[in-house]
């Protein structure tokens, strides 16, 4: 009996953890770290840790509320029907309460412990994802990911504000990189999940305009992304090294975009989706390395 209780508790904890969309949360935190490291000045390590926890909780909050709102369409799609709410492991009410609670806490703690500007930016990012992307855009327009992608681009700007207590065009350069990265990243996934999105009546770009046009736009956004990725060289300490890394990673990104146009198959699209994640980690790791004093 005791063992069963422990298993049930562990299962419940894991399900609430899944509500936070941890894979997205890891990327959010990493890009926030890049914003903090690239910003001029310094911050106490404890405050930096508090800030990152708040950013992670804010991201998780948006993810949980997104799952609460999308529980009807999640039930219709193979990719999402096993999520905690549609599978019945977590009630919709509990998920909403959980998401709202950690979201409010993350913004409140950020405001009290760090500064108001970073707290306001965190709140804007959470609310944008919930109200602009999830509730307004996702089910209404094929531009859902293009516009809604702005919500996922806030973390480096927040990280910058954590250190400087201000916003800067340099922080928004990092924002722009993620903004340009989001469409090719998600469209590569949606090409392989067209039936799911059609069944759930989600007007993804490929569902509305077809796979051929989607692949062309993936290439267009990939080129724009690579060009945008060069901009941090304007303010990073080791600009030549960064440019080399950005061009190297960007050429591979464009190669994948060209490959899916030529091959038009599931495997190439899956490879591009996977690489796009590695690419963003690689690019922001390069930003971090070129912002710190190694010697």
Swiss-Prot record:
Catalysed transformations (reactions): heme b + (2E,6E)-farnesyl diphosphate + H2O = Fe(II)-heme o + diphosphate
EC class name: transferase
EC number: 2.5.1.141
Gene Ontology biological process terms, A to Z: heme O biosynthetic process
Gene Ontology molecular function: any one: protoheme IX farnesyltransferase activity
Protein's UniProt keywords contain Transmembrane helix: yes
This protein's GO CC annotations: plasma membrane
UniProt keyword list: Cell membrane, Heme biosynthesis, Membrane, Transferase, Transmembrane, Transmembrane helix
Pathway: Porphyrin-containing compound metabolism; heme O biosynthesis; heme O from protoheme: step 1/1
Additional notes on this entry: Carbon 2 of the heme B porphyrin ring is defined according to the Fischer nomenclature.
Function summary: Converts heme B (protoheme IX) to heme O by substitution of the vinyl group on carbon 2 of heme B porphyrin ring with a hydroxyethyl farnesyl side group.
Family per similarity comment: Belongs to the UbiA prenyltransferase family. Protoheme IX farnesyltransferase subfamily.
Protein name: Protoheme IX farnesyltransferase
The encoding gene: ctaB
